From Swiss-Prot:
The keyword Lyase applies. The active site is at D11, D130. HAMAP family: HisF (MF_01013). The gene is hisF. CDD domains: HisF (cd04731). This is Imidazole glycerol phosphate synthase subunit HisF.
C-alpha cells in the first residue's frame, strides 16, 4: 500500500517565504532554507517551493535557494513559478530540484508539458491547477496568472489533457478554499482523482489534522495533501498530522 504524503508549501518572494490568504494578503514566514530544514526534521515527505517573485533578481535568488536547499535536504522537492521554457526547467532541475511545477505557462503553451516530459521523464513534471467552482458552468473552472484569469477549461478536462501530454502528477488547488482553513475541496479533489491515472496532490483549505484525513481517506483518496500557513505559523505540525492519520489507519511514512 502506497503511503500518503504530507507536503508543506513555501511561497517564496525575492528569496523569503511568504503566505497569502486567498492569493492576496501576505505575511512573512521566514527563510526558505531554514524552513525547509525544519520541515525535513518534522517528517515532511516532500516540499513545494512556489517562486512568486516578479523580478529577474528574484528568479536568480530562487536558483540560490534551490542549490542551498538541495545541499541540506534529504527529501524530494518541487519548484514552480516562472517556468516557461525547457531551459527554465533545466536550470531548476540542475540546481537540485527533483521536480518542476508548471501552471499558467502550460495553459498558454501546452506543448511545454510534453517537452519537459520527453526530456526529463513524466516523474519530473507536475502540472499545477488553480480551480474555482463556477455556478454558471456547473463545474470547477481553471484560472491562470495566480487566480486572476478564468480559462475555458474545466479542472477535470485540463487535468486529463495535462496527463495525456505527459504530466506525472497534478497539484490541485481549490481557490474557493485557499487560506480559509475550513477543509480541502473534497468534491473537486475526488472528481480529478477519478479522472486521471497519476497522483493528485490536494491543496487549499487545510486548517486541522482531520482535514488531511478527509482528503486522504478512501472516500476521496488523494495521494498527498499540501498546506502552508498552518505549518508555517505552527498551528499544527507535520508530525502531529501524521500521528492523527496513523491513529485513523491511514498509511504514512
Amino acid at each position: 500500500m502506497l503511503t500518503k504524503r504530507i507536503i508543506p508549501c513555501l511561497d517564496v518572494k525575492e528569496g523569503r517565504v511568504v503566505k497569502g490568504i486567498q492569493f492576496v494578503s501576505i505575511r512573512d514566514a521566514g527563510d526558505p532554507v531554514e524552513l525547509a530544514k525544519f520541515y525535513d526534521e518534522q517528517g515532511a515527505d516532500e516540499l513545494v517551493f512556489l517562486d512568486i517573485s516578479a523580478s529577474h533578481e528574484g528568479r536568480e535568488t530562487m536558483i540560490e535557494v534551490v542549490q542551498q536547499t538541495a545541499a541540506t535536504l534529504a527529501i524530494p522537492f518541487t519548484v514552480g513559478g516562472g517556468i516557461r521554457t525547457l531551459d527554465d526547467m533545466k536550470r531548476i532541475l540542475r540546481a537540485g530540484a527533483d521536480k518542476v511545477s508548471v501552471n499558467t505557462s502550460a495553459l498558454e503553451r501546452p506543448s511545454l508539458i510534453q517537452e519537459g516530459s520527453d526530456f526529463f521523464g513524466a516523474q519530473c513534471i507536475v502540472v499545477a491547477i488553480d480551480a474555482r467552482y463556477s455556478e454558471e458552468d456547473g463545474t470547477w473552472m481553471v484560472y491562470t496568472h495566480g487566480g486572476r484569469n478564468k480559462t475555458t477549461w474545466s479542472a477535470i478536462d485540463w487535468a486529463k489533457e495535462a496527463v495525456r501530454l505527459g504530466a506525472g502528477e497534478i497539484l490541485l488547488t481549490s481557490m474557493n478554499q485557499d487560506g480559509e482553513k475550513s477543509g480541502f475541496d473534497l468534491g473537486l479533489t475526488k472528481a480529478v482523482r477519478e479522472a486521471v491515472s497519476v497522483p493528485v496532490i490536494a491543496s487549499g483549505g487545510a486548517g486541522y489534522a482531520e482535514h488531511f484525513y478527509e482528503v486522504l481517506a478512501e472516500e476521496v483518496d488523494a495521494d498527498a495533501a499540501l498546506a502552508a500557513s498552518i505549518f508555517h505559523y505552527k498551528e499544527t505540525s507535520v508530525a502531529q498530522v501524521k500521528e492523527y492519520l496513523r491513529a485513523k489507519g491511514v498509511a504514512v511514512r
